[in-house]
């Protein structure tokens, strides 16, 4: 299945949070998510973003994401850390994760 992989925009914040909650449910930790849509908007799309995010979209629905941020390696210099790569349960096994990971690599140092 081919998805549209694109950089997330502020209006995607609700979908991003829903995917995070879906992951937490899978990990049997649903109560651990204290992040809000406002937090995602502030820290991902505010004046000084702390993370970047790619989303996978199929038929105008966000069904996956790769959330990452810059860091510094004392051995390698600037790099990115992939915090989470999430694909909605009903779309797993369809190549969406591979498409997101490939796009992440292409957008990294």
Regions found by a protein language model. Give the residues of each.
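Conserved beta-strand in the GNAT
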Residues: 55, 61-69
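Conserved acetyl-CoA binding element of GNAT-fold acetyltransferases
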Residues: 78-89
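A short helix-loop-beta-strand connector motif used in the catalytic cores of GNAT acetyltransferases and
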Residues: 44-55
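A short beta-loop-alpha structural element at the N-terminal edge
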Residues: 4-18
């Amino acid at each position: 299945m081919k998805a549209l992989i694109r950089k997330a925009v502020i209006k995607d914040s609700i979908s991003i949070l829903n995917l995070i909650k879906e992951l937490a449910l899978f990990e049997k930790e649903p109560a651990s998510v204290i992040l809000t849509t406002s937090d995602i908007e502030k820290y991902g799309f505010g004046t000084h973003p702390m993370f970047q995010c790619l989303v996978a979209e199929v038929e105008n629905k966000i069904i996956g994401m790769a959330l990452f941020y810059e860091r510094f390696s004392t051995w390698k210099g600037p790099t990115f850390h992939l915090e989470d790569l999430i694909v909605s349960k009903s779309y797993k096994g369809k190549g969406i994760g591979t498409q997101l990971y490939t796009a992440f690599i292409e957008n990294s140092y």
